[in-house]
Amino acid sequence: MARVTVEDCIDKVDNRFELVLLAGHRARQISQGAQITVDRDNDKNPVVALREIAEETLSPADLKEDLIHSLQKHVEVDEPEMASEFITHSSESESIFNTSSQEEGTSFDHMSEEELLAGIEGLVVPEKSDDY
C-alpha cells in the first residue's frame, strides 16, 4: 500500500473524526518510542499510524481506550465507605470523654414565654449608622 487514504481506514473506524484522533494518538506514541507493527517504508509517523489502522495490526478499540486513559487527568476510584470506621471512632471518643452522644443530643435549656419576652425587652437597639 503506497498511499494510505481515509477510505482505506473508514471500514475499520466508522467516524472520520475518531479516526483522526486515533491516528494522531498512535503517531504520538510512535514518536515517543513505541514499537511499530508495519514496515516504515520511509513514511512519517501519521502515515505509519494510518497504515497500522488500515492493516488492522492494532485494534481501534484498544487505541481508543488508550487515548481516553491518556486524556484523563483525575481517575476516580470507587472505594468502600468507611462507616464502620466512623462508628469505632465515635465509640472511642465516648470512652475518652465519658459522654454519650444521646445525652448531649437530648439536653436542652427550657425557657418560659415570660423569660423569653423579658430577654427580648432587655435588648438594646443599635444606633443606625451610614456604613451600609
Curated annotation (Swiss-Prot):
A GO biological-process term: DNA-templated transcription
Assigned protein family: Belongs to the RNA polymerase subunit omega family.
One GO CC term, this protein: DNA-directed RNA polymerase complex
One Pfam family linked to the record: RNA_pol_Rpb6
Region described as Disordered: spans on this chain: 89-109
Quaternary structure and partners: The RNAP catalytic core consists of 2 alpha, 1 beta, 1 beta' and 1 omega subunit. When a sigma factor is associated with the core the holoenzyme is formed, which can initiate transcription.
InterPro entries in the cross-refs: DNA-dir_RNA_pol_omega, Pol_omega/Rpo6/RPB6, RPB6/omega-like_sf
UniProt-recorded name of the protein: DNA-directed RNA polymerase subunit omega
Family annotation (SUPFAM superfamilies): RPB6/omega subunit-like (SSF63562)
Catalytic activity from the UniProt record: RNA(n) + a ribonucleoside 5'-triphosphate = RNA(n+1) + diphosphate
Gene: rpoZ
Feature: compositional bias, Polar residues: 96-105
Any coiled-coil regions, as ranges: none
PANTHER family to which the protein is assigned, alphabetical: DNA-DIRECTED RNA POLYMERASE SUBUNIT OMEGA
Top-level taxon: Bacteria
The protein's role, per its UniProt record: Promotes RNA polymerase assembly. Latches the N- and C-terminal regions of the beta' subunit thereby facilitating its interaction with the beta and alpha subunits.
EC number: 2.7.7.6
Organism: Bartonella tribocorum (strain CIP 105476 / IBS 506)
GO molecular function: DNA binding; DNA-directed RNA polymerase activity
Keywords recorded for this protein, A-Z: DNA-directed RNA polymerase, Nucleotidyltransferase, Transcription, Transferase
